[in-house]
């Protein structure tokens, strides 16, 4: 399993990638449709400007009027090929937030839904 933590301005969330699908929740966006895109590099030293070119379009997420997107995407991405790369949340080709995809501990007893609130908890 792989995981990506997004935390930029008021946009926060944790997305887990499993062999069959990706799922979780993202908060802090205005209502509308956004794209999840995997980029070439996992370098966030200059924010989303240093993550390189888009490589894999994961899918669209739909944010409700409360600023919450519940993410559940079927994708055939090979997890071992995305470790160390970046995931961006984008709208109209503008990268709004990004994070590095890393390896996550696998524990079948844990439900993989996590929200980070405005206090970082």
From Swiss-Prot:
Protein keywords: Disulfide bond, Host cytoplasm
One Gene Ontology CC term in the entry: host cell cytoplasm
Localization terms from the record: Host cytoplasm
Annotated GO MF terms: metal ion binding
Highest taxon listed in the record's lineage: Viruses
Cystine crosslinks: 48-98
Keyword hit for Ion transport: no
One of the protein's GO biological processes: superoxide metabolic process
SUPFAM superfamilies: Cu,Zn superoxide dismutase-like
Record-linked InterPro entries: SOD-like_Cu/Zn_dom_sf
Keyword hit for Disulfide bond: yes
Family per similarity comment: Belongs to the Cu-Zn superoxide dismutase family.
Free-text function comment from the UniProt entry: Virion protein with no enzymatic activity.
Protein name per Swiss-Prot or TrEMBL: Cu-Zn superoxide dismutase-like protein
């Amino acid at each position: 399993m792989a995981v990506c933590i997004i935390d930029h301005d008021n946009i926060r969330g944790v997305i887990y990638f499993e062999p069959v699908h990706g799922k979780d929740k993202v908060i802090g966006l205005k209502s509308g449709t956004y794209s999840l895109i995997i980029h070439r590099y996992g370098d966030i030293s200059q924010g989303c400007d240093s993550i390189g070119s888009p490589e894999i379009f994961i899918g669209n997420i739909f944010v409700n009027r409360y600023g919450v997107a519940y993410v559940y995407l079927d994708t055939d991405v090979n997890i071992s090929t995305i470790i160390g790369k970046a995931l961006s949340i984008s709208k109209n080709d503008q990268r709004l937030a990004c994070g590095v995809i890393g390896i996550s501990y696998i524990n079948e007893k844990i439900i993989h839904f996590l929200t980070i609130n405005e206090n970082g908890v």
